[in-house]
From Swiss-Prot:
PROSITE patterns: NR_LBD (PS51843), NUCLEAR_REC_DBD_1 (PS00031), NUCLEAR_REC_DBD_2 (PS51030). It comes from Caenorhabditis elegans. The keyword Acyltransferase does not apply. Residues 307-567 form the NR LBD domain. One of its GO terms (cellular component) is nucleus. Disruption phenotype: RNAi-mediated knockdown results in embryonic or larval lethality in the majority of animals. RNAi-mediated knockdown results in embryos that do not survive due to failed epidermally mediated process of embryo elongation. Of the animals that hatch, larvae display a squat body statue, referred to as a dumpy phenotype, have uncoordinated movements and posterior patterning defects. Larvae also have anterior patterning defects such as kinked or notched noses. Animals that progress to adulthood are sterile and vulvaless. This is Nuclear hormone receptor family member nhr-25. The lineage of its organism: Eukaryota, Metazoa, Ecdysozoa, Nematoda, Chromadorea. Residues 15-90 bind DNA. One of its GO terms (molecular function) is nuclear receptor activity. Orphan nuclear receptor and probable transcription activator, required during development. Plays a role in male tail tip morphogenesis regulating the expression of the transcription factor dmd-3 in a negative feedback loop. Regulates vulval precursor cell (VPC) differentiation, in concert with homeobox protein lin-39. Involved in promoting embryogenesis, in concert with homeobox protein nob-1. May play a role in modulation of lifespan and immunity. Keywords: Developmental protein, DNA-binding, Metal-binding, Nucleus, Receptor, Transcription, Transcription regulation, Zinc, Zinc-finger.
């Protein structure tokens, strides 16, 4: 393949510089023609939700030699130049979110047309015969240029006849190409058939070619049947969106369209558009006196305003990272164990209930500080806490075990050791092994602080209370934010298992209170907050249509890998 063929068959970005750092442009990335370095930097910043802070005055110079010194100013310059954060895929898969793919395919075709137009005379291969050897790509004859046409010699002389090379000449039209719209990060090559028009194509006075040239030229290249030797099968063709606005229909009522000379109106330079304005395409008239409406002109995308600090903050504030700020610190459960160690009786059941008592107080304070929870009525808040506190309690101790803040055995004041699983399950020895399996699975799956936050909020706004609009809204918000960092349902299956363990532990305490009152009075104080929660829940369940605790049969947990159905909670 000759140098001319390579120039014609692929987009030519040689000579263009990245508007962010000045490096060589590699293609369209997230709405802008940028280099590979700025593309990767922008993608990593958005996907990892990094927040930089400039150590100077937030006006650092960014170029190729110092672009890594201040990532804050570099990211702000990316946004200012027009790169779009919403074009980055959150699932970290290859490829961008291409909403204007047809526009950029047409743009690549225009760029390759301009490269072909700068070629003066190209010798066709000898296999085509001697008659076609003098054939030209683009050579406007003198009689086809009207009197209002600007001198074309400067454009033709840009092409070096000796080295068969050209330089990129930036025009006013390129301001539209740098519009901060979504684009694909891929840079596929086009074949000749993708940008060379078919024979008999009628040039519309408002065609994008007139915008590119800004002159009155009837281009013979558009009506030229390209040699078959240049139809290279190995060049992959990009699909083109042949929508109605890109199809030019023949207008038989106006024979001047097929004349040798067509006069175009002079293309005015594009003015600067503010962030509150939009680009309006004005109407123009042809030499025939017919007015062409704006809807028939070539599609021009509006200039989008650069993202402001408010919009950027809103993008990050909508994630689960904001919810994590309300979580207790990692050492809170360990501090509760230590404080209860010196005050409770040296007995396993008493120690377990006392830990739950102290943690329940913190859970109530945390829930009241949540915006959605605080908007509920006092009765609804009590119902939610009575339904969810055991699940939140188990989630807290499970998170401490996964991250190594607690050992599997905890030594009480008398020297005896109590399994942490027994404390998490409120003294229910039956399902300690199942809880240990949950801890191991979460540790192997990489249970993070984001997952802990989602578990805690999903436990608070339990799905059995979805009849409340506020609860349903809160659950949807948590799941949507959690989906930003997790794309698997395995964690939801484990969460359902924790809910089932919490339900069994709550029923175990009620059975202990009902069947063994002597042991209950020995282990637990009468003014216990945990006992008050259980009594209120049982009284509400007995007076409602929901199955009471004592009527539910024993639950045998299957293997940890099984999927659990919805838990029938006591409250409606």
């Amino acid at each position: 393949m000759t140098d001319v063929e390579r120039m014609v068959l692929r987009p030519n970005h040689e000579g263009e510089m990245c508007p962010v750092c000045g490096d060589r442009v590699s293609g369209y990335h997230y709405g802008l023609l940028t280099c590979e370095s700025c593309k990767g930097f922008f993608k990593r910043t958005v996907q990892n939700k990094k927040q930089y802070q400039c150590s100077a005055e937030a006006n650092c110079h960014v170029d190729r030699t110092c672009r890594k010194r201040c990532p804050s100013c570099r990211f702000q310059k990316c946004l200012t130049m027009g790169m779009k954060m919403e074009a980055v895929r959150a699932d970290r898969m290859r490829g961008g979110r291409n909403k204007f793919g047809s526009f950029y395919k047409k743009d690549r075709a225009h760029r390759m047309q301009r490269n072909a137009m700068r070629v003066s005379t190209v010798q066709v291969p000898a296999v085509l015969g001697a008659q076609s050897q003098a054939q030209t790509f683009y050579q406007p004859p003198e009689h086809q240029v009207s009197s209002s046409t600007t001198d074309q010699n400067n454009q033709i002389n840009y092409f070096d006849q000796t080295k068969i090379k050209t330089e990129y000449i930036k025009t006013e039209y390129d301001a539209h190409l740098q519009s901060p719209t979504l684009s694909s990060s891929t840079n596929q090559q086009l074949s000749v058939s993708d940008f060379i028009m078919r024979p008999g194509y009628l040039v519309d006075p408002q065609d994008s070619l007139a915008v590119l040239l800004g002159s009155t030229i009837d281009d013979p290249l558009l009506r030229h049947t390209f040699p078959a030797a240049y139809q290279l099968n190995e060049v992959k063709q990009e699909p083109f969106d042949y929508s109605e606005q890109f199809i030019h229909h023949s207008l038989h009522d106006y024979p001047t369209y097929t004349s040798n000379t067509t006069n175009y109106a002079t293309m005015m330079p594009m003015t600067t558009v503010s962030s509150t304005q939009s680009l309006v395409t004005s109407t123009s008239s042809t030499t025939t006196g017919r007015m062409t409406e704006a809807s028939s002109t070539s599609p021009i995308l509006p200039l989008c305003p650069a993202p402001t600090e408010k919009t950027v903050d809103h993008f990050y504030n909508s994630s689960i990272a904001e919810m994590c700020k309300t979580l207790p610190d990692d050492a809170q459960i360990a501090r509760i164990f230590t404080s209860v160690k010196g005050t409770s009786k040296p007995e396993k059941h008493a120690f377990s209930i006392q830990v739950a008592e102290e943690n329940l107080k913190d859970i109530v304070i945390w829930a009241k500080n949540d915006q959605l929870f605080s908007k509920l009525s006092l009765d609804d808040q009590m119902i939610l806490l009575q339904t969810s506190w055991t699940t939140v309690h188990i989630v807290d101790i499970t998170n401490a075990m996964v991250h190594g803040n607690l050992l599997s055995q905890y030594k009480m004041s008398n020297g005896d050791e109590v399994p942490v699983g027994l404390v998490a399950l409120l003294g229910n020895q039956t399902f300690v092994s199942s809880w240990n399996d949950v801890v191991i699975r979460l540790r192997n799956m990489g249970f993070t602080n984001f997952d802990y936050c989602a578990f805690r909020f999903l436990a608070l706004f339990d799905q059995s209370m979805d009849s409340f609009p506020a609860v349903s809204t809160a659950r949807s918000r948590v799941l949507q934010s959690w989906r930003e960092v997790r794309c698997t349902t395995a964690f939801l299956e484990i969460f359902e298992q924790i809910r089932r363990l919490a339900y069994d532990s709550l029923r175990y305490l009620w059975n202990l209170h009902s069947n063994c009152p002597t042991n209950w009075e020995q282990f637990f104080p009468e003014a216990s907050l945990v006992l008050e929660m259980i009594r209120t829940t049982v009284n509400r369940s007995a007076s409602s249509s929901v199955t009471a605790i004592t009527q539910v049969p024993a639950i045998q947990l299957p293997t940890p890998q099984a999927t659990y159905t919805a838990v029938p909670y006591m409250a409606s």
